């Protein structure tokens, strides 16, 4: 399957190209739209009768410095050369996400770049030429975007064929010609929330699977340790109409084929069980907010200035990533609470509540069971919690002109790390259910039971660290949710 990048990319396209390495091509509609606005830029350069930011002016607080048209190409090269990142390289996945997101913005047709620029980005994606981008020192995405653009011109460094090479050598090895940067092309290469948008899109995809798995792990825990099902009654959602709460309660209820209005003898279970719908539901609503933000930013022009086919060029703040930053911070905070509740339920297992033997051990005392895995879960949640403060509370100032930043690059980096850590904490909870099932033959009904049995079948290792990593991988790759769906459960 080839992904055609036209004017309406979606998050599925992002995942297909970035992770599944599906080939991608530029669509005819996008090519035509880009050609129209590129013609506007070329007319501006030829006439040189009005100042247009980044075309015939300097940058930032030097926006009032006129640039001779003869220096237009050098101006663009200098801009790419001036931007920096520091530290260890970003993961290849993050760089691919930024490349796809930037290509998608160019394809929208308001950046004024030639189709050749997008073609070169897509050539690198298809060939596996991945620019080396330092993970630190990004003021929004400027540095990361510029390092990607630098490689397109044959400069910088890139990973190709398992090697770290000079950018020109990587392009040559892949059979790709370096790009000659024309007026206004380096500015949009650098501008806009590409890295943060791509990473938010991937995190949304991952969080969808994580939250479904968190509901399923919670369902397993209720089946093994809980006693009062009324917390999952649809009548609660009817009088408290929070969509996320209702959805999480439904998943738990249907995963266990649970009758919620019974004569249970226990008045109520611990809060970590009783509030699964509220805690996971709150995260679902944060996810529901983040999803359209990622989708909108992926396909919307994110540049300054914006170029229109009728010749109008508008200076604006469309490159600012505040929507991404706010959505990423909110989702990260909500996921930390999901992990905290999962860790508290692991504590209930270790206590020996319900069907669980103490420490979830076959021979408590002689064996330590999963108590150390509980420690790991607690540490993971704490580590994630340190990242959950607002990333955009500070800003970077440049000569009083570029005086606020969204810091969405930081927010989405924190979100990616949070998803990974909370996924592992949820994996520990699910591992507890699997181990109780193995040790005691306790029953977990319905689709939740199918998940437990399916994980048991895939868990060969006895090393606890490997077990946690295995279960976390089954959450990440969708196996856990697939097992539930195959058992008849409707998952979002």
Describe the residue ranges of each PLM region:
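Short alpha-helical scaffolding segments that buttress acidic/His motifs in well-ordered protein cores
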Residues: 14, 79, 94, 98-102, ...
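Acidic, glycine-rich active-site loops and adjacent beta-strand->loop/helix elements
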Residues: 58-59, 104-105, 125, 137-139, ...
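Alpha-helix capping at helix-to-loop junctions
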Residues: 103-107, 123-130, 157, 216, ...
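FAD-binding glycine-rich core of flavoenzymes that anchor FAD
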Residues: 110-135
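Short, well-structured alpha-helical patches and their helix-loop capping segments
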Residues: 109-113, 136-144, 199-202, 206
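Residues that scaffold, gate, or flank divalent-cation-dependent active/transport sites
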Residues: 9-46, 50-55, 59-96, 118
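C-terminal auxiliary extensions adjacent to catalytic cores
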Residues: 1-22, 26-33, 37-48, 117, ...
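FAD-binding core of FAD-dependent oxidoreductases
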Residues: 53-75, 82-104, 132-155, 163-171, ...
């Amino acid at each position: 399957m080839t992904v055609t990048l036209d004017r309406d990319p979606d998050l599925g396209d992002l995942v297909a190209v970035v992770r599944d390495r599906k080939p991608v091509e530029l669509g005819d509609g996008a090519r035509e739209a880009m050609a129209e606005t590129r013609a506007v830029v070329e007319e501006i350069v030829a006439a040189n009768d009005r100042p247009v930011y980044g075309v015939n002016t300097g940058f930032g607080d030097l926006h009032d410095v006129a640039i001779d048209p003869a220096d237009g190409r050098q101006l663009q090269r200098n801009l790419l050369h001036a931007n920096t990142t520091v530290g260890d390289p970003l993961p290849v996945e993050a760089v691919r996400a930024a490349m796809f997101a930037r290509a998608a913005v160019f394809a929208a047709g308001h950046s004024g770049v030639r189709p050749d620029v997008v073609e070169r980005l897509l050539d690198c994606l298809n060939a596996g030429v991945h620019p080396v981008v330092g993970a630190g020192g990004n003021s929004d995405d400027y540095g990361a975007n510029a390092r990607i653009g630098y490689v397109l011109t044959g400069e910088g460094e890139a990973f190709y064929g398992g090697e770290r090479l000079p950018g020109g050598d990587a392009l040559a090895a892949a059979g790709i010609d370096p790009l000659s940067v024309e007026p206004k092309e380096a500015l949009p290469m650098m501008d806009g929330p590409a890295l943060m948008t791509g990473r938010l899109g991937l995190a949304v995809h991952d969080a969808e699977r994580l939250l479904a798995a968190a509901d399923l792990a919670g369902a397993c825990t209720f089946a093994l340790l809980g006693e009062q099902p009324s917390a999952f009654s649809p009548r609660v959602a009817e009088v408290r109409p929070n969509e996320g709460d209702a959805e999480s309660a439904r998943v738990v209820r249907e995963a266990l084929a649970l009758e919620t209005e019974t004569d249970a003898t226990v008045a109520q279970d611990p809060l970590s069980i009783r509030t699964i719908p509220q805690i996971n539901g709150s995260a679902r609503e944060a996810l529901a907010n983040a999803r359209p933000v990622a989708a909108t930013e992926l396909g919307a022009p994110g540049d300054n200035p914006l170029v229109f086919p009728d010749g109008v060029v508008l200076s604006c703040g469309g490159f600012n990533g505040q929507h991404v930053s706010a959505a990423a911070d909110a989702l990260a905070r909500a996921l930390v609470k999901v992990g905290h509740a999962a860790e508290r339920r692991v504590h209930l297992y270790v206590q020996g509540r319900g069907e669980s033997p103490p420490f979830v051990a076959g021979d408590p005392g002689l064996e330590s069971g999963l108590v150390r895995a509980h420690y790991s879960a607690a540490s993971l949640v704490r580590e994630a919690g340190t990242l959950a403060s607002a990333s955009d509370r500070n800003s970077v100032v440049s000569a009083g002109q570029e005086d606020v930043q969204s810091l969405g690059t930081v927010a989405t980096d924190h979100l990616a790390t949070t998803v990974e850590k909370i996924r592992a904490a949820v994996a520990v909870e699910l591992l507890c259910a699997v181990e109780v099932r193995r040790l005691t033959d306790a029953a977990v009904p319905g689709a939740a039971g199918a998940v437990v049995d399916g994980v048991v079948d895939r868990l060969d290792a006895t090393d606890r660290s490997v077990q946690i990593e295995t279960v976390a991988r089954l959450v990440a790759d969708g196996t856990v949710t697939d097992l539930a769906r195959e058992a008849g459960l409707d998952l979002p």
